[in-house]
Structures are given as structure tokens and as C-alpha cells.
């Protein structure tokens, strides 16, 4: 969604304007080699997704990082729609935090969008010494021109949910966003809504607990989170904590509605496969309620007798009509109508693989949702892109074949009128065929921004 406004900053004035933007032609994806047998650095892949191009569905450029075992994960921009009113700002640098090494790479995508180049490396010691933080995750551009990055830990691997500020021009570490001593026990994602003077952050777990895989005992030991943290956007103080309980364990991606006047949003909670709605109450504080629950399946031939869906990423359409999320273990993508914010209604579902396959080693003994799957009705609509890798340590644990074969990128055709999802069988990017060996491609970014990178003021 690249801006076409003369004299404007990056992005679009409103989310609805962004929906009218031109079709995407390329995407960027981090590709990971950590936890594979391939001793090569992670890299940024540029993929051609223009159906009219001779390179359609091909990786057209690879930018290797200068170090091994970084664990690239998510990415963000130096400037986005939050800077729309500032014509001096350009969306020309992609920010790549490294989840394990704690490096932050700044990539130049402005000089040649189809052949990105490394612009700067922020070393871990800058985060350690200047901020007392490590394991950076989510990067968001701010209206001030600065870049804010959430963290998951301290330099010793303990949980610590703080925020690093980078200068938007030099990319030097400025310091902490949060007030001294006010970091949350755990960190992961965040989203801000300045009109309500609020930011919400989430919790994954302590880096030393999740660094090499998932152990349920670590949940019982308190090494994973289950809370949302509410921050005063102006004073940078943590003003409220919402404990979601066991059903809200491991709250990952948090999404406010795109309408900057809205005072509500949703968060996907991985362990119990729930979605909570959070909202501002008439009293002016914040509350949360469970609005979606994906039942576990009773199985045999798997690690546990009950298999959760394991909700990972969630996103909201730019018109705030639909919520999408993935069940990483069950293997399906879901679409919910959220026009009734308190009562989301599933209107689309497509299965792409996962741990439950016909003639596979896992046998389903009981599935409470067996008769509730909607039939795809793709009349006209848009596109949803998905990848199969989540995080290399969990990939290795739950999908060992993914380590050997690499991940894939798929396209889902979306009915944005009445709902419906269908796999596009003419689209596939196979990262198992990469020159250095099978790679684990994770989160996508469009050069012009998208519904998880841009925040409107």
C-alpha cells in the first residue's frame, strides 16, 4: 500500500484509503537457518508475487546477514502511516530485530526495492548497556520519527518486557521508552492508540525457557506470561495489568482496531487457543473478555492426548470487519466477522497441513468442531499470504520435517464480502529449494506497508 499523495509522508491518511492502494508486486521475508544443520546466516528474501511477471513465485534476491544464528523473526519500518503528515519522512528502511542474538539490522529497501542492502547493524551490547534489555521482537515506527522495539528479556535471559528507542535517521540507540524500573515481567508484541493515550503490550516467555523449545513444565514454573500490560502513552508508565488467567496463557500478537478513534482490539493467546477482546470501560480503565475459543482435539500418536490449535499470528482487515488467525498445530487459517465486536462469527476456514493429516501418524479421537466448518465461497476478494514456519526451536520440536524440507509460502483467496477462504493452487513459494539449503521463512512485509505494520494517528 504505497502512498501516491504528492507532498505527503509515507503510507495513507486513513486505513480505508490504504485499502484502495495498488496491488503488491514483491514481499520481503526473513529466512532462518538457526536450529537447522546448515551453518549459514539468516537472510532477507525478496519474492516476486506479480502474476504477470516471469519471476512469479520466485525468490529474486537474497540478502545474507553478516552473523550466524541470529533468528530473524519479525520486521518493521523506519516510517509508516503514523508519519503521513510529515513529507520529510520516507519508508525506505526495513528494521530486522534478531530474537536470539539481540542484534538489530537496518536494511536499505529504498535504493533498490528489488535488491535490498544492509545499511546498519545495531550490536547487542548497545541494547545491553544502554537499555538493560535483550531479545528484541516487534518494531513500530512512531509519529515522532523514532523507532520503538519491544524486548522479551534482559541480557541474562530472564523475562523483561521493555522497549528500545532508535533514532529514525541515524538508527542509534537512544535508550528506553519505559520509565526506569517499569518494565513488564515478560514482553513480546505491542500496539499503541494515541487518541486514547494508551499502549497495550503482551507476554511470551523468558528467553532462557523458550530458547531451545517448549516444555510444559516451564508454564507451571511461571516462565511464560498470561497478562496484558496497559501503558500511558504520554508518561510512558505502566498503569494497569490485565491477567487473562490460564485461558489467556501466552498472549502473543495484539491488534487494536485500525480506526484510530477505536478503544478496543483483540489478542491471540497461543496455549489455550483463545482470542480475547480488550476494551476501554466507561470508567476509563481497561478490561478484557474471552470471545473465541478453539477446542483442543483428543488425539493419539502425538506428544500429548490433547492437541491445542496453538493460535500464533492474528490480524485485522483494514476496514475492521474481519479477524484472521492461524492454528499452527491444527493447520488451519480462520476468518471471523467481527462487526459485532463482542461476538465474532467464523465465516471462513481453510486447512493447509498441520499435525492432523489424512493417513498421518496422528489419529483424531474427538473433534468438537467437526461439523462447524464453513464452506468456502470465493466470489471476489483479496489475498492473504501465509508461511509455515513459526520459530526455529518450535519448528524443530513440533515439525521436524520442516527443518529438513524448509517452509513454504502460500496464498489464500479471501471473500471480503460475506466471508470465505480458499487455497490458491496456482501459487507456491518453496523455500526448501534455496541455494544454501532448506530455509525457514517466517513473517512477510509488503514494501508499502500492511495491516500489521502501520498505525494511524
UniProtKB/Swiss-Prot annotation:
Pathway: Organosulfur degradation
Annotated EC: 1.8.3.4
Pfam families found in the cross-reference section: SBP56
Keywords: Cytoplasm, Membrane, Nucleus, Oxidoreductase, Protein transport, Selenium, Transport
Keyword Transmembrane helix: no
Catalysed conversion reaction: methanethiol + O2 + H2O = hydrogen sulfide + formaldehyde + H2O2 + H(+)
Enzyme class, spelled out: oxidoreductase
Subcellular location: Nucleus; Cytoplasm, Cytosol; Membrane
InterPro entries the record matches: Se-bd
GO BP term (any one): protein transport
GO molecular function, one term: methanethiol oxidase activity
GO CC field: cytosol; membrane; nucleus
Membrane-topology annotation of the record: Peripheral membrane protein
Similarity field: Belongs to the selenium-binding protein family.
Role played: Catalyzes the oxidation of methanethiol, an organosulfur compound known to be produced in substantial amounts by gut bacteria. Selenium-binding protein which may be involved in the sensing of reactive xenobiotics in the cytoplasm. May be involved in intra-Golgi protein transport.
UniProt-recorded name of the protein: Methanethiol oxidase
Species whose genome carries this gene: Danio rerio
Gene: selenbp1
